C-alpha cells in the first residue's frame, strides 16, 4: 500500500465561519484643528490606519482636505451657505494643523439669488498674495432698481457690465496682493470687500447681492513650519530657548 497524504483527512469541515476582524482596530483617531482665523478651532476628527513598518500615519494624513461649513467654524448660522476647505499641513501628536485651501457657496444659495428682471455679473482674477500663495477669486453681483425707478426691469447695458467687471477685478487684485492668505481669509468672513465693491460701483449701476462666491488655491509656497505654527497661535518669534548651565567632570589626579 502506498504511503502518502490522505486528501480527505486534510479537508476542513464545511460551514465553518471565518474569523471576522474589526477593521477599526487597525485605525486611530486624530483631531482636526482649524487656523486661529476662525473662532471655533475644533473642526472634528478623522480616521487613519495606524503606523506599521515603513507606512507612517502622518504621511497618509498630510495633504488631506476636509470641507467644513463656515457656520460651524464661526458659531453663527449667518454663514451657513459658505463651505470652507482646510488642508492638513502638519501632524503634532494627535492634532492635525490645517491651513486654508478654498471656499465655495452652496448650490441652493446660488440658485436662490438668480431672479428675473435683473442682470448677473461675474468676474474672476488670479492673484498672488504677499506670502506667495496664488489664488483665483470669483465674484458675483446682481443689478437692482434705482430708488426712484418705476420700470420693473433693472437690466444693465454691456458697457455698464464691462465697467463694473473692471472695478471688481481691480478691487480684488488690490485686496489680495496687499494681504497674506490669513489676512484675506479674515476679510471674507465679515464681507468687507463686498461692501467696498457696492460703494465703488453705485455711480455706474446700483448692485445687490455682491459676494465673493468662490476662492480656489492654485499654488502654495514651500512648506514653512514656523508660519504654520504662528497661524495656529502655537509659536512666536520671540520665544527662545534657555541656556542650560553645564557641569564639569571632576578630574582625578591619581587612579
From Swiss-Prot:
<feature type="modified residue" description="N-acetylalanine; partial">
    <location>
        <position position="2"/>
    </location>
</feature>
<dbReference type="GO" id="GO:0022627">
    <property type="term" value="C:cytosolic small ribosomal subunit"/>
</dbReference>
<keyword id="KW-0007">Acetylation</keyword>
<dbReference type="InterPro" id="IPR018281">
    <property type="entry name" value="Ribosomal_eS1_CS"/>
</dbReference>
<dbReference type="InterPro" id="IPR001593">
    <property type="entry name" value="Ribosomal_eS1"/>
</dbReference>
<keyword id="KW-0687">Ribonucleoprotein</keyword>
<dbReference type="GO" id="GO:0006412">
    <property type="term" value="P:translation"/>
</dbReference>
<dbReference type="GO" id="GO:0062040">
    <property type="term" value="C:fungal biofilm matrix"/>
</dbReference>
<comment type="similarity">
    <text>Belongs to the eukaryotic ribosomal protein eS1 family.</text>
</comment>
<keyword id="KW-0963">Cytoplasm</keyword>
<dbReference type="GO" id="GO:0003735">
    <property type="term" value="F:structural constituent of ribosome"/>
</dbReference>
<keyword id="KW-0689">Ribosomal protein</keyword>
<dbReference type="InterPro" id="IPR027500">
    <property type="entry name" value="Ribosomal_eS1_euk"/>
</dbReference>
<comment type="subunit">
    <text>Component of the small ribosomal subunit. Mature ribosomes consist of a small (40S) and a large (60S) subunit. The 40S subunit contains about 33 different proteins and 1 molecule of RNA (18S). The 60S subunit contains about 49 different proteins and 3 molecules of RNA (25S, 5.8S and 5S).</text>
</comment>
<dbReference type="Pfam" id="PF01015">
    <property type="entry name" value="Ribosomal_S3Ae"/>
</dbReference>
<protein>
    <recommendedName>
        <fullName>Small ribosomal subunit protein eS1</fullName>
    </recommendedName>
</protein>
Amino acid at each position: 500500500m502506498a504511503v502518502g497524504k490522505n486528501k480527505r483527512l486534510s479537508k476542513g469541515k464545511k460551514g465553518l465561519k471565518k474569523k471576522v476582524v474589526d477593521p477599526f482596530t487597525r485605525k486611530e483617531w486624530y483631531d482636526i484643528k482649524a487656523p486661529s482665523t476662525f473662532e471655533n478651532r475644533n473642526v472634528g476628527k478623522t480616521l487613519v490606519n495606524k503606523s506599521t513598518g515603513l507606512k507612517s500615519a502622518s504621511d497618509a494624513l498630510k495633504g488631506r482636505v476636509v470641507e467644513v461649513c463656515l457656520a460651524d467654524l464661526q458659531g453663527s448660522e449667518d454663514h451657513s451657505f459658505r463651505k470652507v476647505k482646510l488642508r492638513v499641513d502638519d501632524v503634532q501628536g494627535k492634532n492635525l494643523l490645517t491651513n486654508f485651501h478654498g471656499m465655495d457657496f452652496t448650490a441652493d444659495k446660488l440658485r436662490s439669488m438668480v431672479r428675473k428682471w435683473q442682470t448677473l455679473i461675474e468676474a474672476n482674477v488670479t492673484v498672488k498674495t504677499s506670502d506667495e500663495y496664488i489664488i483665483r477669486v470669483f465674484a458675483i453681483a446682481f443689478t437692482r432698481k434705482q430708488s426712484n425707478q418705476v420700470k420693473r426691469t433693472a437690466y444693465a447695458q454691456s458697457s455698464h457690465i464691462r465697467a463694473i467687471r473692471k472695478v471688481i477685478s481691480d478691487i480684488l487684485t488690490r485686496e489680495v496682493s496687499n494681504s497674506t492668505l490669513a489676512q484675506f481669509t479674515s476679510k471674507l468672513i465679515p464681507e468687507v470687500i463686498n461692501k467696498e465693491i457696492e460703494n465703488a460701483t453705485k455711480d455706474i449701476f446700483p448692485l445687490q447681492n455682491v459676494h465673493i462666491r468662490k476662492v480656489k488655491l492654485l499654488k502654495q509656497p514651500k512648506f514653512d513650519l514656523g508660519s504654520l505654527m504662528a497661524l495656529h497661535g502655537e509659536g512666536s518669534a520671540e520665544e527662545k530657548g534657555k541656556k542650560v548651565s553645564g557641569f564639569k567632570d571632576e578630574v582625578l589626579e591619581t587612579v
